[in-house]
Amino acid sequence: ETLKSNGVTPIVSGTKNAWPAAAWFDYLNMRVNGPEFHINLMLGTEKYDDPRVKKAFEYWAELLDNGYFIENAASYDWQDVLPFMLQEKAAMYLMGQFVMDSIPEENKADYDFFRFPIIDPAVPIGEDAPTDGYFAAANAPHPEAAKQFLAFLGSKEVQTYVAEELKRLPTNTEVDTSSFPEASKKGMELLAGADYIAQFFDRDTTPEMAEKGMAAFQAFWNDTTQIDTILADLEKERALIFAAE
């Protein structure tokens, strides 16, 4: 409300491609209902028409209905909304660390990040931290060499190089992080303090359910009065998709 009263849009999001909206569902569902329920929903063992899911959507609707998001979010891709922040017309963005790659060097010092706000202190903390991995084909002609190469890619030395060059958090716990930028150290502390690390909506559920879910999130963003209809439709899709698994 303070930001709005000063002519600043509190939150930007570009939902032209649906995945930025999915991040909002991930976090609100984990903050309201806990990461265990969220992941079970992703795995198809909980139902979308469960009152707990509706409760998460109601928190989301409150943010949208109060005008805390940028107007016409569906007309923007995720990078299109960055100028609003650079011009100090907007304040916050739920986005991954990679967003800093699109911020001019001279502006990077102006930006910081914080944990998605806790809604219920009694609920375990879940965080979205999509992890990129390396894989070898099951029928690789040289499986032992492939395993050795994968071990090399996951080694302390290579993980250090990747972290320094790409500015991404390493997965190898032996990497010396003492010389890392403060933002990276802060990110690692944030994840270390989490009770569960999720991978993101479209990675944690099936591709078919992810497609239906993200389309539903876009529809909800445009009309928050349709929660019951949207969740009923998602539940029908969940039942069909996971019955076929």
Task: Describe each region flagged by the PLM.
Residues 1, 81-85, 99, 146, ...:
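Short, hydrophobic alpha-helical packing/hinge segments within bilobed ligand-binding/sensory domains
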Residues 66, 104-168, 215, 224:
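Extracytoplasmic/periplasmic substrate-recognition and gating elements
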Residues 12, 91-96, 112:
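Paired acidic/hydrophobic, glycine-rich loop segments that form the ligand-binding mouth/hinge
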Residues 14, 78, 95-100, 130-132:
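Beta->alpha turn/N-cap motifs
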Residues 71-86:
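Short helix-initiation/N-cap motifs at beta->coil->alpha
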Residues 42-73:
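Glycine-centered hinge/linker elements that transmit conformational signals in sensory
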Residues 1-46, 61, 90:
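Extracytoplasmic/periplasmic solute-binding protein
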Residues 5, 194-245:
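Conserved C-terminal helix/tail region of periplasmic/extracytoplasmic solute-binding proteins
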